[in-house]
């Protein structure tokens, strides 16, 4: 990696918006660190010479910190973080499962906070960089079977 290359960390990169964003940035020549729980998909994506796999479960705060430290050690710097991790479990009101609902909150809300917490000190000390948080339409309006 050269010093002039832009560098990005993307979570939720194994599918959906995160995967599409990772592929787009890699195509444009960015060095892309990708994270998600599904290591086998990340490793397949890392066949692209601009993509590097860093498996991660965003629910684990320490894992978020350690993964970011590993990325910084290897990339030397990060210009942009895009946090796309999310999960969706559509249920009718009679099928709601508290344990699953807590898991959705852990990933979609607390997982993002864990990632922001992992990078905030780095960006403050560097006096630069950007964080983007991506969610789906599910956060703005109701969808069928999403009580």
Question: Whereabouts are the PLM-identified features?
Answer:
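Conserved glycine-rich Rossmann-like NAD(P)H-binding loop of the short-chain dehydrogenase/reductase
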Residues: 28-45
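Conserved glycine-rich cofactor-binding loop
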Residues: 14-15
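Residue(s) in the substrate-gating loop at a strand-loop-helix junction
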Residues: 136
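Conserved NAD(P)H cofactor-binding loop of Rossmann-fold oxidoreductase domains
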Residues: 84-89
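Substrate-binding pocket helix/loop in short-chain dehydrogenase/reductase
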Residues: 92-93, 97-105
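Active-site loop immediately N-terminal to the catalytic Tyr-X3-Lys motif
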Residues: 94, 141-147
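Rossmann-fold cofactor-recognition segment
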Residues: 48-62
């Amino acid at each position: 990696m050269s010093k002039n290359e832009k560098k990005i960390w993307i979570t939720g990169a194994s599918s959906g918006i995160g995967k599409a964003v990772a592929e787009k940035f890699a195509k444009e020549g960015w060095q892309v660190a990708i994270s998600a729980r599904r290591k086998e998909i990340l490793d397949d994506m890392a066949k692209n010479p601009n993509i590097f796999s860093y498996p991660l479960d965003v629910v684990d705060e320490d894992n978020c910190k350690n993964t970011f430290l590993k990325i910084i050690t290897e990339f030397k710097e990060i210009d942009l973080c895009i946090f796309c991790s999310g999960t969706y479990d559509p249920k009718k009101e009679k099928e709601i499962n508290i344990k699953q609902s807590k898991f959705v909150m852990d990933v979609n809300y607390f997982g993002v906070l864990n990632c922001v917490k992992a990078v905030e000190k780095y960006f403050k000390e560097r006096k630069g960089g950007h964080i983007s948080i991506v969610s789906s339409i599910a956060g703005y309006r109701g969808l069928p079977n999403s009580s």
